[in-house]
C-alpha cells in the first residue's frame, strides 16, 4: 500500500505543488492559455485533468497581473507583452499600425476571448515601447511562428520612415537653393552678349590677347590674366555653359571700363596692354564690312571728305576706312589679273 500510495502521489500531485520559479510558471501558463485553441482543449483525452490545471493557472495569472500593475516594468510583464503579441492576432499592436498587417496572418488563426484580459496591460506596455513616430520596435511581432506578420512589420517601418526623413522639406529645399547657382542665364542671352562684346571690342581696336592680359588690371578678386584662346572661345560660344556664365560679368566690367576711358579721351594703357608699341591689325565687324562693300560698289575711289563721312557714320577711324578702300582696290586688281591669265 505504501508503494501504491507513493506511486499515486508521484503520478497525481507533483504538478499541484508550488513551483520553484512561480513567475516563470505563471508566465508560461498564461501564454499557453492565450495561444491554445479551444478545439484542442475539447478534443483532449485528459480534458478534466487539464481544466483543473488551467483553472489554477488562471488564478496564478490573475495574481501576476495584479502584481504587474504595481510594477509595470517587471521583466515578466515585458515577457507577457512581447510573447502575447505574436500569438494573438487580435492584439493591440495590430490596431496601432497599418491595416495591411491584418491581411498577412494565416487563416487558421482564431480569435480567443481569454486573451482579452491581457490586452489592457498590453496597451500600456506597447505605447511605452513604441518609439517616436509610431514605428514599432524590432522585437514586436518578431517570433518565427509568424513570418508574414514579421515581414509586414518591416514593410510598415519602411513605409513610415519616409515621412520621418522628409519631416522638414523646406530645409532640404533651402539647401538645394543655396547649392545651386543664384541666377540662371539664358543661352540666348549669352550668345547675344558674346556677339555684342566682339563688335564693341573691334571698335575699340583691342585684340583678344589684349583683353585677356588687361583683365588682371581690373583688380577683380580671384580673376587674373586669361589667354587669347579663352576670349576667342567665349566669342565663338565654344566654352561650357558654366564658364560662359562665370566669364560674362568679368568681360562686362572690362568693356564698361574701356568704353568709359575712350569717352573721356583718356589714355589708360593698363586697360589695353602694358606698353606694347607695335601697330596692331585692325578688325572690322561684319555689319560695318557690309556697309563698306556697298560704298565701294558705288565709288571705289572716294574723296577724303567722303572717307571722313563714312568713318563718322560707321563709328570707325578715318585712317581705317582709307586703308580698307586701298586694300579693296588692290584685291580687285589681283582678281582681274588672275581671271585674265
UniProtKB/Swiss-Prot annotation:
A UniProt-annotated Pfam family: Homeodomain
Entry-linked PROSITE patterns:
HOMEOBOX_1, HOMEOBOX_2, POU_1, POU_2, POU_3
* InterPro entries from the UniProt entry: HD (IPR001356), Homeobox_CS (IPR017970), Homeodomain-like_sf (IPR009057), Lambda_DNA-bd_dom_sf (IPR010982), POU (IPR013847), POU_dom (IPR000327), POU_domain_TF (IPR050255)
Name the DNA-binding segment ranges: 277-336
User: Where does the POU-specific domain lie?
Assistant: 182-259
Per its UniProt record, what Gene3D superfamilies does this chain match?
A: Homeodomain-like, lambda repressor-like DNA-binding domains
Short sequence motif POU-IV box: positions:
55-65
GO CC, sorted alphabetically, is: nucleus
Q: Where mainly located?
A: nucleus
An example molecular function term from Gene Ontology annotations = RNA polymerase II cis-regulatory region sequence-specific DNA binding
Q: Where in the cell is it found?
A: Nucleus
**A GO BP annotation:** regulation of transcription by RNA polymerase II
Transmembrane parts of this sequence: none
Keywords linked to the UniProt accession: DNA-binding, Homeobox, Nucleus, Transcription, Transcription regulation
Tagged with keyword Transcription regulation: yes
Keyword Lipid biosynthesis appears in the UniProt entry: no
What family is reported?
A: Belongs to the POU transcription factor family. Class-4 subfamily.
Q: What does this protein do?
A: May play a role in specifying terminally differentiated neuronal phenotypes.
Q: What is this protein called?
A: Brain-specific homeobox/POU domain protein 3
Species source reads Gallus gallus
Which gene underlies this protein? BRN3
